[in-house]
């Protein structure tokens, strides 16, 4: 759901084109800068602040002073209902927070990221703006990927021999850790695919190859599984939105592949075929890390389950890491503090209570609904779905599906690049239906 919080104070007043051009150029420059800086989070400042946060502070203040308060245009605020539910649940849970400072920091991050999201949605006016940001995203992702590969080569003396190994360097490039980098690259691959009808094939293939190698270098099992989920969703979406006469052959091919996969699975379970291959993968590639990672997360989640039983309304935002563990249960050799939840769903349920998890699920449902709005509007306004609309629809669904899966084992709701993407998604729905920031429309 999105609402119009304000209306133009003088709806009949025409703004001269000469006056709007500098503002449009400034808005586009800011959008590009935000895209370039979104994955640049190191070095880290106080409270995990980054360079982008300083830029955004001035941008949010300027947007409020020169756009919102003068009432020059309608302010579009998508996703307001689920975010209000999250906020109410978070405030209630603060009553049981072991650390109010951590709760206050988490709430401040919520407010800041949503304010930035609103600014982005209201600055994205046209399809050209959306394309500009996506192109900037892809080039930024290529640079980030090259940074990750440079870290790997520097640490290994120029060798790629440990790229698929179970041990070795896991580069983070300009992000906090390899798992965060994997999440960013997973999203970036599908953003790049959305431009397949708008940029040349060779640069696209090169950028996809660089990002793919960097994604492998992270050795992130969660990132790989999320990418697989997104890739499957992308294929299904492209088939479902494509020409009807091609669906039969594609469906037959898919059934053949599924049948072969089922036969191989039966042979493996019945006669043990493939056991050596799986054992080799577990011993010599990063797939073998999956068991260790799962055990570590299960210990964390067991402790959070105990905390939830004590405080069913929540333990306060950001307070998963403030719990004190016993000697036998401690998760760090040098500390009695617990670790973060490593799951958005568990974090919202345990830290923010029932309203928090309902708000999170509502947020995800609203995002999928926004994609449906975009697709229906694109088909209606274009007299049929153009290829670029199919590609962007498939990319949005793929990123959402990958994020839904990745959120099982990572907390990504405070990732700046994630909020940048959902701003693109919501702006796409508004633009496709003709409801941009300058249009005085009702709640939608």
Where are these regions (language model features)?
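Transmembrane signal-anchor hairpin modules in multi-pass inner-membrane enzymes, especially those
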Residues: 1-105, 125-135, 198-202, 245-252, ...
């Amino acid at each position: 759901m999105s609402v119009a919080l304000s209306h133009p104070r003088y709806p009949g007043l025409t703004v001269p084109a000469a006056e709007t051009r500098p503002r449009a150029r400034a808005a586009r420059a800011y959008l590009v800068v935000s895209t370039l800086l979104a994955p640049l989070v190191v070095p880290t400042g106080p409270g995990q602040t980054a360079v982008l946060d300083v830029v955004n502070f001035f941008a949010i203040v300027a947007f409020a002073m020169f756009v919102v308060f003068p009432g020059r245009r309608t302010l579009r605020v998508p996703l307001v209902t689920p975010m209000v539910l999250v906020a109410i649940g978070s405030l209630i849970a603060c009553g049981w927070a072991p650390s109010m400072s951590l709760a206050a920091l988490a709430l401040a991050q919520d407010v800041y990221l949503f304010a930035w999201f609103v600014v982005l949605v209201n600055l994205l006016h046209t399809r050209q703006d959306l394309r500009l940001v996506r192109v900037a995203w892809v080039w930024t992702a290529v640079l980030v990927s090259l940074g990750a590969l440079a870290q790997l080569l520097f640490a290994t003396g120029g060798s790629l021999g440990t790229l698929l190994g179970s041990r070795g360097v896991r580069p983070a490039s300009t992000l906090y850790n390899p798992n965060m980098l994997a999440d960013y690259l997973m999203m970036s691959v599908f953003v790049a695919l959305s431009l397949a009808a708008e940029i040349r094939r060779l640069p696209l293939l090169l950028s996809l190859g660089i990002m793919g190698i960097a994604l492998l270098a992270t050795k992130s099992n969660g990132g790989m599984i999320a990418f697989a989920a997104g890739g499957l969703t992308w294929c299904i979406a492209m088939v479902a939105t494509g020409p009807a006469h091609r669906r039969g052959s594609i469906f037959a091919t898919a059934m053949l592949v599924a049948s072969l996969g089922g036969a191989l699975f039966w042979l493996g379970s019945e006669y043990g075929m493939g056991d050596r291959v799986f054992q080799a993968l577990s011993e010599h590639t990063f797939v073998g890390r999956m068991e260790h990672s799962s055990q570590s997360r299960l210990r964390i989640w067991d402790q959070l389950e105990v905390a939830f039983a004590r405080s069913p309304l929540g333990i306060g935002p950001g307070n998963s890491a403030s719990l004190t563990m016993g000697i036998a249960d401690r998760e760090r050799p040098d500390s009695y503090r617990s670790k973060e939840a490593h799951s958005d769903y568990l974090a919202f349920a345990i830290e923010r209570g029932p309203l928090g998890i309902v708000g999170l699920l509502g947020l995800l449902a609203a995002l999928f609904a926004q994609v449906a709005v975009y697709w229906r509007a694109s088909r209606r306004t274009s007299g049929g779905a153009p290829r670029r609309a199919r590609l962007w629809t498939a990319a949005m669904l793929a990123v959402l599906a990958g994020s839904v899966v990745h959120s099982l084992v990572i907390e990504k709701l405070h990732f700046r690049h994630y909020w940048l993407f959902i701003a693109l998604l919501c702006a796409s729905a508004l633009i496709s239906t003709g409801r941009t920031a300058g249009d005085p429309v009702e709640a939608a």
